[in-house]
UniProtKB/Swiss-Prot annotation:
Family of this protein: Belongs to the universal ribosomal protein uS5 family.
Annotated keywords: Chloroplast, Plastid, Ribonucleoprotein, Ribosomal protein, RNA-binding, rRNA-binding
The protein's assembly and partners: Part of the 30S ribosomal subunit. Contacts protein S4.
GO MF entries: rRNA binding; structural constituent of ribosome
Name of encoding gene: rps5
Protein name per the record: Small ribosomal subunit protein uS5c
Length: 174
């Protein structure tokens, strides 16, 4: 009992992953004997180097819900292609349910201009210069998933050149 290891809240020391809880919600289920209380946790996990995931965990206590959320987030990891200025290669829209998120690259030094869960997902993915706008819904989970949807659609210049069958230099000429 004396040699218990302390667990870090934010970063995993061995792998460099950081987790942030976006929302803790107390939910109820009506059963025959009354109401059963449980907690739903939405969290984002990322290594700030181009990998990020969103997870949801439900349990009777918050700690159990967070653990389930971390395992769920690790199952839904997305790799983000970052530019040299730590932005995204091109503008993109992401959709999840009624939530629509517009993501646009911005100039170096402008920072992450976004709100709510969108900001958390973008920061943990390693994007440092971006403009984002939420449209349609204020739902935390749907907006976070909409960002992931948009980030999965991103393509690098080399991927676009390969798909078109042209040399990459032709994409840069005016």
């Amino acid at each position: 009992m004396a040699n218990r290891k302390k667990q870090s809240k934010g970063k995993d020391k061995d792998s460099g992953w950081e987790e942030r809880v976006v929302q803790v919600k107390r939910v109820t289920k009506v059963v025959k004997g009354g109401k059963k209380l449980s907690f739903r946790v939405i969290l984002v996990i990322g290594n700030e180097q181009g990998q990020v995931g969103v997870g949801v965990g439900k349990a009777s206590d918050v700690i159990g819900a967070v653990k389930k959320g971390v395992t769920d987030a690790k199952k839904h990891l997305v790799t983000v292609p970052l530019t040299k200025s730590n932005s995204i290669p091109h503008p993109i829209n992401g959709i999840s349910g009624a939530a629509k998120v517009i993501l646009r690259p911005s100039a170096p030094g402008s920072g992450v201009i976004a709100g709510g869960s969108v900001r958390t997902v973008l920061e943990l993915s390693g994007v440092q210069n971006i403009l984002a706008k939420q449209l349609g819904s204020n739902n935390t989970l749907n907006n976070a998933r909409a960002v992931l949807n948009g980030l999965t659609q991103l393509r690098t210049f080399s991927e676009a050149a390969k798909d078109r069958g042209v040399p990459i230099e032709s994409l840069y000429s005016t």
